[in-house]
Amino acid sequence: MAAHGLKRARPAELVPGTLSVITARMDYLPRDTPPDWVDHEWQRLQRPGEAIVSVYARGRDYHKVLRARLQQLADRIAAQIGPFGHRVFTDSAPVLEVELASRSGIGWRGKHTLTLHREAGSMFFLGEIY
């Protein structure tokens, strides 16, 4: 982490020319998740002989999904304003994503170091466009 100190704290050190950062969140659960999903999870916890995979790891690789969505957003922006140098990050570079999310209004850093949001809790991924 020390080797990337300046790159973490100064976006332009990581991607030269960066003036702004777009920060986004993607919820763990798909939109069509039944409202009683928590009840099902509690029932699963009552069966100690059954292995349980964490909710965030049950779907497709979030790195690929969120990166693709952010790239689509960057492409739409470029279609409106013209080409701009950018990079998309999803947990893949020395980026202070929790700090960026806090500053952008997505949430705040909880005592457990995750970003918290009043409705979503901490059940979401973060990604950035530099």
Residues covered by each model-derived region:
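Auxiliary alpha/beta "docking" domains used to position bulky ligands
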Residues: 1-130
